[in-house]
């Protein structure tokens, strides 16, 4: 058999295998070529969008996002140059970030979008403010904070122990372990300077402790930064039961919000976001923030506008809203009550008849009122007539028309009267359906 001639181009190619090996290889699946083709296809897909094209796509998307943010943030105002966001504290990257850190960039983006709404001072009509002050409580009760509650509990406990135990067999009141105090004093130092980043693990476990109020008192909530208050609200709203969350809202969050509004004439963005996060438990939010704010009798128009904006922006279950409207309608009137009732009525819930009856009686109680009612009161009555005129009974409709004669408003009363007269009462509608 002659010698096989090898060409230059085929010097690296493999020779034909023996016939027996070719037959055996023919029975097997040839996966090598397919794998090579698949790998080649992946390379083609990866090379389809090059780095230069990717940069162009990201640049175009960024420009479109900036245009949208400028339109939504400034409205008709001329567009201002986009400022670079800066953190209030040292932005040192840390390992082991958890869910709190993942949400923080989203919070910063939201701050950019709403900087016009929250950084500007809330404009209040002086006439409305004077009208609301006429209905404020002249002798308001003393506001209680968490520190006051804890000190009262400690005093009561000490008195009880001293009364029950004799001097010989008496034991001192159990105090916190010194090591626990040392840990949470360190947590207090962190929260007093907190801007962003990871919270101490010792702080995150406070909701699981039986004496969480006493531990929280050690950290001095009144000295926390606004960012720390936001993170604390997230933790307590998620992990506490509704009754405990209500106490946190009422004793810690609400006093801080009111103090901030009174001092700066607007609400810090982080505290505003804390109020929104607190709505995770709507029952606790109404019982711990809105109802105490109305019951205090000292809620200013600025406070009502800021807190009311959260009601208009957030979705609230109808049962909690109905219970809150019933409670506000039955309590002593204050100017802020009209704002909150109007915002809740604007949500157009299918309210129970008991709530509607309470709202009607709430307005009818002003038939003998000698003081001039604020415009907010007439606006709330107009909203009730617009949204629920078909759900009122004939007697209620006639009583409200009589109320308009006793408490008139030159612009709003004709509109309210037109709404009431154009609707068919619910009892008349029921009679027609029965006859058919």
From Swiss-Prot:
Q: Which residues carry this modification: Phosphoserine?
A: 54, 97, 166, 413
**Compartments (UniProt record):** Cytoplasm; Nucleus, Nucleolus
Query: Region entry Disordered: which residue ranges?
Result: 1-105
Q: Quote one Gene Ontology molecular function term.
A: snoRNA binding
According to its UniProt entry, one GO biological process term is: blastocyst formation
Pfam assignment, any one? Bystin
What does the function comment of this entry state? Required for processing of 20S pre-rRNA precursor and biogenesis of 40S ribosomal subunits.
Q: What is this protein called?
A: Bystin
